[in-house]
């Protein structure tokens, strides 16, 4: 065990602190304050909000190969070096930020490159479920590119690139993108509908996917109110 090994090293006057590990090249020494400062700087740089996270890492190829060969040779079933690196980083991040590590579905993924000493944060999508009613004809469900210029912009579409000035997708997604500081929105409606039909009753279900949202905690009731207000204004304007 560890205690017996320490005693033997002491009797033989061997200082293990001065010995480089032939398997991992002391890679765990890189999990230091400098690394966690880089992570913190990246979080602050992006201004990203999260409650759950996952850690992924890149370690030198030769270390990975030695670890694999050792496990294969002695039929070891212990955790790999890379998994141990991820576990230790995740534990430290939990201590620092009081956020939970989540393996199935997480807000962000910390990708730690121990080869080039770089940190990258992958921001996972935010999904918002809802229903909508359409009380006026002539509004498409999704953004409709101009049929003449194919979305590039021309005189026919007043250089908007759109066949119709508004869509259900745009009315909803623009507000959410602004609040989440997301990169892009994708509208997933439950089925398609013709532009000249109404959507009454309990509404049509949809899921709005926000890619790379910096903020995740938004007031959905306020979003609903803002979307309705803008839609009413657009309807009133178009009817005048």
Predicted regions and their residues:
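Catalytic/RNA-binding core of pseudouridine synthases
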Residues: 1-240
């Amino acid at each position: 065990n560890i205690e017996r090994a320490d005693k033997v090293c002491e009797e033989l006057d061997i200082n293990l602190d001065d010995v480089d590990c032939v398997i991992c090249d002391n890679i765990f020494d890189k999990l230091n304050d400098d690394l966690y400062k880089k992570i913190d700087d990246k979080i602050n740089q992006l201004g990203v909000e999260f409650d759950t996270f996952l850690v992924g890492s890149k370690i030198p190829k030769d270390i990975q190969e030695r670890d694999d060969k050792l496990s294969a040779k002695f039929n070891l079933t212990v955790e790999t070096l890379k998994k141990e690196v991820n576990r230790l980083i995740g534990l430290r991040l939990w201590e620092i930020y009081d956020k939970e590590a989540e393996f199935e579905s997480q807000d962000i993924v910390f990708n730690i490159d121990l080869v080039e000493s770089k940190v990258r944060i992958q921001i996972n999508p935010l999904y918002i479920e809802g229903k909508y009613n359409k009380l006026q004809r002539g509004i498409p469900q999704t953004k409709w590119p101009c049929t003449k210029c194919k979305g590039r912009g021309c005189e026919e579409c007043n250089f908007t690139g759109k066949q119709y000035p508004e869509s259900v997708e745009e009315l909803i997604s623009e507000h959410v993108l602004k609040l989440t500081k997301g990169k892009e929105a994708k509208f997933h409606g439950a089925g398609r509908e013709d532009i000249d039909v109404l959507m009454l009753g309990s509404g049509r279900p949809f899921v709005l996917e926000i890619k790379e949202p910096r903020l995740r905690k938004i007031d959905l009731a306020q979003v609903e109110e803002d979307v309705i207000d803008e839609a009413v204004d657009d309807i009133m304007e178009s009817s005048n």
